Structure formats: C-alpha cells, structure tokens
A protein has these predicted regions:
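Phosphate-ester processing/binding pockets and catalytic centers
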Residues: 1-247
Length: 247
C-alpha cells in the first residue's frame, strides 16, 4: 500500500477578476505538493523526524512547520537553517517520492476557462498531483497493478476552511471517478482523508516539500529544493513536468 501526504504553500486565491490581476500582497504562485511512501516506511519516517526534533531541543510534539520562525523555536538563524536542511534530508532518502504542482495563478485565472476561483485552482492542482503519483505507481508495478493508494491532507480548523475541505473532497472523488485523458485513478481510495498536521509527521514533511518548491518559484531560492532533489519524481532523467509540473 502507498500513502500520499499532501500540503500546500502560497494561497490559491488572491485574484481580482474585475481588474484581471493579482491582489496586492498575494503570492504569484500556488504550490500543492505530495510525499508518497510505502506503508511499511511509516514508523521509520516518524522516528527519523522525532530524532531531528530532539537534536534541536524540540519536543516531539512540536509541529515541524516550514514557515515557523527561528525565534519561535528558540534557535539561531544558522541552527534553524541546519534544522530545515536535516528535515529535507529525511525526505531525500525516498527516491521518486515527491511531486509538486506549481500554479502560476494570474496565468491560470486569465487563460483557463475551467479555473474561476480558488476551489477550481485547488481542484485542478489536485488532479495533476494524483495523475503523477498514479503514473509513478504504474512505473513501479505496471499498468495492471491493484496496489491501493490512500491520500491524506491537513485538516482545516475553522468553518470557512471546512467548506474548502468539503469542496476538496468532492474534487478528489470526481478526479478518482474521471481521471485524466491519459489515465484513470482506480487505485486511489474512495475518500480523501483529513488529519491534523500537528499529529502527523508525514504531513509535516509534505509541508516542507511544498515550502521548498514554493521558495524556488516565488523567491528564486533553490537552497532547500536542491536538498530535496533526490526525492523528486523523475522519469527518463527528467523532473520538469514529471516531478514538478508548472502550470
């Protein structure tokens, strides 16, 4: 069994339809990323992340968040960078485990007729993500494989975002039923599973995947993405469009 943990970086919204431009302060990109592992690796990954937390004097209950400030963690800036690097190195141990979907929001809202709001953008990102993980499982086991895939994501914690969760669940189920013009998604479980990221080491690692990819596109900073590269999905020595899809 494969388990995919997903998280995002940047906001899916922030576009002014009337002015046909991004709202001031909105991110240029929205990134949805996933970290896929085999079920047998679950406990080992949790142990590795806990060891890194302990090394940096953090409680194992402390959530590893990409956007945490070093002050809030009681670290110096250098310690904080080393800590983030070590978290990324955990992910890098798992080859072809990471997929990132990078949405140029202004371009998507202007040029894609089926993307009209943040729900559409998120749903389209999810579809592209599922497609690439399905391709990866097919590459490993052949087109007729029946190995199940379960997808977990961070739960939202307020009423407004719970509405987004419901829309995302609908999008997931629709994607599972329809697939894409290239392939179906029969191996994915019937429902997307929501989990509190504070209690999931793997969702925390997915957050680092999304953060590192977002940092590269939004700020042109590849420092942490370069650490992750061994884990990013590759096919025929190609990452672009395969492990990282810019849309």
């Amino acid at each position: 069994m494969y388990i995919v943990f997903i998280d995002e970086s940047g906001q899916p919204g922030g576009y002014d339809e009337e002015k046909q431009e991004l709202i001031k302060g909105a991110t240029k990109y929205f990134v949805l990323s996933g970290f896929m592992i085999e079920g047998n690796d679950l406990i080992d990954i949790e142990r590795k992340l806990n060891q890194v937390k302990i090394k940096y004097n953090l409680s194992i209950e402390t959530e590893a968040k990409w956007n945490s400030s070093y002050n809030s963690l009681g670290m110096t800036l250098d310690e904080y960078k080393r800590y983030k690097s070590e978290v990324c190195k955990i992910i890098a141990e798992y080859q072809n485990s990471v997929v990132g979907i990078v949405m140029d929001k202004e371009k998507c809202y202007k040029e894609r007729k089926n993307i009209n709001d943040y729900n559409d953008l998120y749903a389209y990102s999810l579809n592209l993500l599922m497609e690439r993980f399905c391709m990866e499982v097919t590459d490993r086991h052949g087109r007729d494989t029946n190995i199940p895939i379960i997808l977990f994501t961070d739960s939202r914690k307020n009423d407004n975002n719970n509405r987004l969760d419901k829309e995302l669940q609908k999008s997931y189920r629709r994607a599972k039923q329809i697939g894409t013009k290239y392939m179906g998604f029969p191996n994915f479980s019937e429902s997307l599973v929501f989990i509190d990221s504070q209690y999931s080491s793997e969702v925390q690692l997915a957050d680092f995947c999304a953060g590192a990819i977002f940092k590269k596109f939004e700020d042109n900073n590849e420092e942490f993405l370069n650490i992750l590269k061994p884990a990013i999905r590759m096919h025929n020595e190609k990452i672009e469009g395969v492990g990282i899809k810019e849309f």
